[in-house]
């Protein structure tokens, strides 16, 4: 009801004791800091990689928002915490939060200082771009180079490419074929 109350959690709950009246409101301020979660080593493809979360929300990088191929970005320990947050102000993404993350990006085999724009995973591919997306980011240059050079084969099911396979290699255009 417009009054600030400081409360302590007890066994995972925050009790609010008061005499309740019709129309009372409880407004919660739950700060959600950006966190970096390390992949478990059992997942070989994600070794030495992190994902970026805020509260329960996983964020990802889309090609449409970033200057480099999203597979070439890496977030070293020194970049962790170098973030700003905002929200899109127009279009289909209006009101959707984003994170700007300090990082590096590969340009050839060299690393350049860069900024990564991340959107909530639930909101990716909503701009009709069918572009690349990444959730797991390398923690160093060597891991980024190794990941960039791997080829991914993904099944593609669209009206134009039914039962085709998309072969993608970082830095190259996608090629569609019958999987042969």
Regions found by a protein language model. Name each.
Residues 12-14:
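Short aromatic-glycine motifs in intrinsically disordered, low-complexity regions
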Residues 3-5, 9, 18-21, 25-179:
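C-terminal beta-rich recognition modules with glycine/proline-rich loops and embedded aromatic residues
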